[in-house]
Amino acid sequence: MNKANMLRTDKDMQIILFSEVSVGISANSILFIAHVCMILGENRPKPIDLYIAFLSLTQLMLLITMGLIAVDMFLSQGIWDSTTCQSLIYLHRLLRGLSLCATCLLNILWTITLSSRSFCSTKFKHKSPHHISGAFIFFCVLYMSFSSHLFISIIATHNLTSENFIYVTQSCSLLPLSYSRTSMFSAPMAIREAFLVSLMALSSGYMVALLWRHKKQAQHLHSTSLSSKASPEQRATRTILLLMSFFVVLYILENAVFYSRIKFKDGSILYCVQIILCHSYATVNPFVFICTEKHIIKFWESKCGRIVNI
């Protein structure tokens, strides 16, 4: 992609991207602060609250990093050096991977928490946070190693004229790699993402089947007219299904745009669309948590009430 074409990119795309980043940073900050305060105020915080707090922190850092990259894409005069380019692009790639990993593990932990109360599952529930934490550390090391090639393939190119370089920002470009090297780095990442998305789909499907069976048992034992209010389990199911469906749709759209960019090699608009889709989940999912978890709303209502009383 030529830098001149990037500068002529539709201004609407720039506004959408900066608006998305700003809204996402605000929403994740609200979610993170609420969960940290609730965790510090409890003697035994729930594992799910810890993972939601970590997910919101990861997404917050991801969007801040993307904001810095977007500034260099549209507003900067190309003043970054190679170290800055490599560090920020590497950090952004790492945070993207950790966000996907944290979302997957949170989905699994949520499924385990809502599973049946058999002896095996109850015993596993107590150990699951430790297993999931170990899995997360493993994926952290894996992501760091998979993204390490960016330190040699990202360079600062302030006066880019060659079409061989791949545009990243006004300051940074990606060195062209051979087909074998590209496959060596892209294949493990594709397998990793497919594995995590498959785990999310399986855990969500299992939980939906589990709660559907629970609902049938409840209808058999009790009259459905006793209460029309949704149970906490049903609300949790709706939340997970909504997040999972939204994630899958964005994942499909993002990959479709990516392959379209490969076909139309000089697509500055497609580049912006891919970036917007890539960060839409990190922007939207905090609102889903805030709207579906009543204790977060009550927390902020109490804080706002105290400020008003003062």
Curated annotation (Swiss-Prot):
One of its GO terms (cellular component) is plasma membrane. The keyword Transport does not apply. Glycans are attached at residue 159. Putative pheromone receptor implicated in the regulation of social and reproductive behavior. Disruption phenotype: Mice lacking all but one V1ra and V1rb gene (12% of the V1r repertoire) show a lack of chemosensory response to a subset of known pheromonal ligands and changes in maternal aggression as well as male reproductive behavior. GO terms for biological process: response to pheromone; sensory perception of chemical stimulus. It is a multi-pass membrane protein. InterPro entries: GPCR_Rhodpsn_7TM, Vmron_rcpt_1. Residues 1-20, 72-93, 156-190, 260-268 are extracellular. It comes from the Eukaryota. Keywords: Cell membrane, Disulfide bond, G-protein coupled receptor, Glycoprotein, Membrane, Pheromone response, Receptor, Transducer, Transmembrane, Transmembrane helix. GO terms for molecular function: pheromone receptor activity. Belongs to the G-protein coupled receptor 1 family. It is found in: Cell membrane. This is Vomeronasal type-1 receptor 40. It comes from Mus musculus. The chain crosses the membrane at residues 21-41, 51-71, 94-114, 135-155, 191-211, 239-259, 269-289. Residues 42-50, 115-134, 212-238, 290-310 are cytoplasmic. The gene is Vmn1r40. Disulfide bonds join 85-172. The keyword Transmembrane helix applies.
